[in-house]
Structure formats: structure tokens, C-alpha cells
């Protein structure tokens, strides 16, 4: 479309797809008609275990987009990620600027997880999680780690992260010799998963959208 000369910016034909412009500030037209900016969408999904988090639909793998099969909302992308074996709160949006603010490791919101582990961590192990462990040349720490409930052979922990490194919780627990049985993200900042059913999604409220970027 662009290379065919059908797109103009500020009354000038543009043929380079990577031509820099700010969509909100330029007069963009396609075939002489004003380009309508898509409505911004902000969603939360209760991701089921076993689905791959990816930025596009793939026929060869079972991805999170399966949960949106019955909807017609246009392009959206995950904001952050959960690995295939993890479940819980996953955000989606078609607003890349908002997504970048949410996922900024320096200023983005904290993330809270409920984690079932094989074995019973003692106070010293919980302290190590907060103090940090070394793994693959990285120091991995939790903002907080506390016991939720204890069974005969396993326990549920609540772990809060201030930054999201790849498989961070699994790596911390592996370094302390605990096997992760389940890992569920229950909140991001002040936005909680609540009673949203597994595999279901809903729109974020305006207050939730603002809260996730500190507005």
C-alpha cells in the first residue's frame, strides 16, 4: 500500500514504509481519506497453563490467541509474558507506548505470584529469596516472599517481583533446590486477577489503565 503511493503524510506522498512520523500529530491519508486511528484496547486474560505467549498467531503452536478466537478486536499484543507452564494475569493492548511503560523494569508496576513448591521452605529460604541468589551471572531477588499455606509435602508462597527477568521465580527457586509445581500471576500493581475464569478475558477499566502506568 505505501510503496504503491497510496499513503500521504501532510499532503506529501510517502513510499518508504519506515518513514518516521507521529500518528497523533500528522495528517495521514490513505487513498485521499483520513486514516482513522484504531480504538485503543486494554485487556486482561487469565492465561491457562500450556499456552505459549507470543506476539502473533501461530498455526504450529497452541498460543494465548486461542482465548480470543470468538472475538473481533483487531491486532493486540501481550504486555509482558508468562512462560508456557505458568498461568494467571496477562495483559494485552494495541497501545505500544502504554505497554512500554507497563513493562519498564525501572518504573513499571510490581508483579505478585502465588507459587506452589515441592517441599516446605523455612524462614532462611524465604530470606534467601528476598536477599537474592546468583544464577548465570545475574543476581535474582524478590521484593517479598512469604508463606501462604503449608501442606504435608508442599507449600504455597506469595512472591512479589519488582522486575521481570526471564523465568526469574523458577530460577530463584531452582537455586534453592525447590521444584515449582504451579506458578500463578495474581496481580500487576493494583490490578488483580480476581475471579476471572481461566481462559476468560475482560477489558480494563480506565482507572486500571491509568494505575498501571502511575497516572
Regions found by a protein language model. Give the residues of each.
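Basic, flexible Lys/Arg- and Gly-enriched helix-loop patches that mediate nucleic-acid binding at interfaces
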Residues: 1-215
Amino acid at each position: 500500500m505505501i510503496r504503491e503511493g497510496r499513503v500521504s503524510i501532510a499532503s506529501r506522498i510517502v513510499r518508504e514504509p519506515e518513514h518516521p512520523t507521529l500518528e497523533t500529530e500528522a495528517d495521514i491519508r490513505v487513498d485521499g481519506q483520513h486514516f482513522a486511528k484504531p480504538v485503543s484496547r486494554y485487556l486482561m486474560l487469565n492465561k491457562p497453563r500450556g499456552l505459549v505467549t507470543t506476539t502473533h498467531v501461530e498455526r504450529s503452536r497452541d498460543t494465548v490467541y486461542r482465548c480470543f478466537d470468538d472475538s473481533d478486536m483487531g491486532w493486540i499484543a501481550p504486555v509482558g509474558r508468562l512462560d508456557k507452564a505458568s498461568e494467571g494475569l496477562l495483559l494485552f493492548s494495541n497501545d505500544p507506548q502504554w505497554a512500554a511503560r507497563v513493562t519498564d523494569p525501572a518504573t513499571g508496576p510490581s508483579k505478585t505470584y502465588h507459587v506452589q513448591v515441592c517441599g516446605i521452605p523455612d524462614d532462611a529460604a524465604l530470606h534467601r529469596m528476598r536477599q537474592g541468589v546468583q544464577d548465570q551471572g545475574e543476581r535474582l531477588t524478590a521484593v517479598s516472599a512469604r508463606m501462604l499455606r503449608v501442606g504435608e509435602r508442599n507449600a504455597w508462597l506469595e512472591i512479589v517481583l519488582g522486575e521481570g527477568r526471564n523465568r526469574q521465580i523458577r530460577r530463584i527457586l531452582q537455586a534453592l533446590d525447590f521444584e515449582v509445581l504451579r506458578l500463578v500471576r495474581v496481580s500487576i500493581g493494583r490490578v488483580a486477577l480476581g475471579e476471572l475464569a481461566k481462559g476468560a478475558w475482560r477489558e480494563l477499566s480506565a482507572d486500571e489503565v491509568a494505575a498501571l502506568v502511575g497516572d
